[in-house]
């Protein structure tokens, strides 16, 4: 009896490895690599088994090209990218995870009688005011002074401080540098720095912490401005000289508002004039003062007509050579890190709903990214400690 086989297109096999590697064991990954080399041809039965394991429809194995994924968020990239099909499995998983959390919290808050988040879409019909005026309105909404970040000790302090202020108004802020708890599923900073999901009751900002600490603040503020306008975005800004914006006029406006929130013009110029160094050195000193990245500082200085584009390019060339590596030596333990990555209000809501019997422990484990009751209780203890 002849066993039916089918030579699957290598594009399909490569795509399977990209999006389903976490569902396949080593044996299946090795089999697929052998098929890709042409050393063996898969049987129909093997493809049926692979379809179930990978959760990929059986018919997709007979296509000549991978199907286009309909991920709405990918349509809202800051910078145009012609290679739309080349989306990493890590990004897809992270979008799926954050959408699940945002959807759950949206339903929870509606059920519990919460009011919609006032900040979302406040600037939707506000197109006449200057970037500086809008920045002042946003600062006023959060009760922040114009020099709010100058007095803080470090980049991390500034980020944490602003995150706390934002989340106190019901906006969800989640962070991570990899998918779930799998450090092998690292996020790529060249693919995206952050994204924002617009929801009336549970708007969510996600920050890719693979980015440097001094760059995260700009990403957070940039996405906050998108929330002000009520516009979803996948922030993949790369600080290039002439980026291919999908919506150039709007994104330039968002960037200028974000600049004004971080770099108040009056204080920026005052510090600039007080430093007796070269312009190159001034950029680094002011970046440290405002708890921002040298590139964001250089672009702002150019917009304030203090430096040339040539110096911006020089700063970009130097900073792009830096490789940021996070050190785990002497750092917080697993559960402290998990509690930090999760939005505190979200984690509290899940735990409260679970304790009341409205959410199953299995669903809670999935939402909070824990595997068992011990991990759940460890996380719960840290969340409750912060609530005191």
Where are the regions that the model predicts?
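Active-site hotspot residues in diverse enzymes, especially metal/ion-binding acidic/histidine motifs
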Residues: 1-388
């Amino acid at each position: 009896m002849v066993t039916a086989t089918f030579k699957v297109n290598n594009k399909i096999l490569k795509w399977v490895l990209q999006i389903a590697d976490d569902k396949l064991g080593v044996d299946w990954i090795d089999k697929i690599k052998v098929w890709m080399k042409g050393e063996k041809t898969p049987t129909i039965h093997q493809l049926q088994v692979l379809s179930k394991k990978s959760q990929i429809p059986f018919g997709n194995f007979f296509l000549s090209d991978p199907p286009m994924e309909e991920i709405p968020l990918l349509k809202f990239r800051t910078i145009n990218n012609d290679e739309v099909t080349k989306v990493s499995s890590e990004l897809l998983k992270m979008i799926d995870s954050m959408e699940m959390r945002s959807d759950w919290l949206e339903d929870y808050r509606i059920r519990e009688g919460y009011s919609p988040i006032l900040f979302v879409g406040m600037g939707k019909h506000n197109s006449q005011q200057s970037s500086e005026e809008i920045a002042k309105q946003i600062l006023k909404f959060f009760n922040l002074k114009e020099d709010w970040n100058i007095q803080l000790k470090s980049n991390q302090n500034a980020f944490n401080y602003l995150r706390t202020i934002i989340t106190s108004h019901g906006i969800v802020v989640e962070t991570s540098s990899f998918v779930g708890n799998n450090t092998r599923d690292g996020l790529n900073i060249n693919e995206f720095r952050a994204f924002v999901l617009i929801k009336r009751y549970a708007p969510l900002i996600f920050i890719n912490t693979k980015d440097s600490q001094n760059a995260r603040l700009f990403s957070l503020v940039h996405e906050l401005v998108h929330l002000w306008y009520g516009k979803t975005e996948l922030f993949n800004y790369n600080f290039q000289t002439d980026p291919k914006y999908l919506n150039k006029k709007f994104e330039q406006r968002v960037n200028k508002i974000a600049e004004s929130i971080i770099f108040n013009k009056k204080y920026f110029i005052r510090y600039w004039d007080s430093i007796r160094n070269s312009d190159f050195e001034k950029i680094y000193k002011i970046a440290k003062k405002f708890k921002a990245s040298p590139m964001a500082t250089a672009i702002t200085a150019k917009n304030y007509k203090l430096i040339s584009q040539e110096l911006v390019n020089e700063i970009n060339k130097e900073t792009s050579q830096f490789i940021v590596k996070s050190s785990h030596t002497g750092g917080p333990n697993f559960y402290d890190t998990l509690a930090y990555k999760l939005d505190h209000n979200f984690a509290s809501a899940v735990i409260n709903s679970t304790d009341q019997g409205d959410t199953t422990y299995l669903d809670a484990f999935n939402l909070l990214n824990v595997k068992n009751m011990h991990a759940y209780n460890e996380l719960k203890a840290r969340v409750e400690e912060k609530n005191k």
